[in-house]
C-alpha cells in the first residue's frame, strides 16, 4: 500500500517505528488491525472504489467498535482546508472539551446505548496516573511540532499530492482529541486513528522540498521522533495483556486482567 501512495518508503517506515505504530501493532492488536482497515478504507473511498470501501469499513468495525465513527468523521471532514487557525482551534477546543468530558461521554452513552460498555472509563482511576498524563502531554507536544511543520509546508505537499494535502486535516483533528485525552488517557487511542496518516503525509512533505532544506528538517524531525519513541516506551509502556512497567510506574509487572481484578474492574 505504501509503495502505491508515496515514493519515500524509508521515511514512512521511520515514522511507523519512531511514532509508536509498530508498538501499537504488538500491544493493542485488535485496534491496530481496525486502524489499518480504516486507512485502507479511506484510501479506497478517495479513489472512488466504493465496494472495497464498504467491505473494509465492515472489517474495521468488526475488529473495533470505534472504527465506524472514525470513518464517518474522515469522510465528512476531508474537504476542510488545513490552516494554522484550525490547528490552534483544535487544541483550544480540545482543552475546553476536556473540562466537561465526563458529561459529554455520559450524553454519548445515553444517545448510543450499545456504547454503554465504555461507561467504566468515566471514573477510571488510571486516568489520574501521573505517568499516563505525562505520556499524553508528550505525545501532544511531539505531534504539535510535526503538524506545525506540515502546515507550514502544506503548499509543497499540495503540489506533490492533493490527496495528502486533504489528509492534513486528520492530523489537526487528532491534536484536538489528543488534548482531550490529557483528562482521560484512553481517549488517546482514538487520536491515533487520525494521526496514522502522518506516515503518508510527512514523506510527501519532504518530497516537495529542495535537497538542502529537506536534509536539515529531516534531521530535526527524525531526532524528535526518536526521542519520542524512547519517551513513550518509558511513560506509556504498557501492553494490552502485560504491563511494561518502569521505574516511573513502580509496580511489579502484572497482566492488565489481573490489574483490573485487583482494582475492581473485572466482572
Label each residue range with its predicted role.
Residues 88-93, 210-231:
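Signature aromatic-anchored transmembrane alpha helix within multi-pass, membrane-resident enzymes
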Residues 20-24, 52-76, 175-178:
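Membrane-interface alpha helices of multi-pass inner-membrane proteins
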Residues 26-32:
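Short acidic/glycine- and proline-prone juxtamembrane loop motifs at membrane-interface regions
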Residues 2-19:
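Transmembrane-helix signature of polytopic, membrane-embedded enzymes
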Residues 74-194, 235-258:
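Alpha-helical transmembrane segments and terminal signal-anchor/GPI-anchor hydrophobic tails
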Residues 1-7, 45, 206:
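Transmembrane-helix signature of membrane-embedded glycosylation machinery that interfaces
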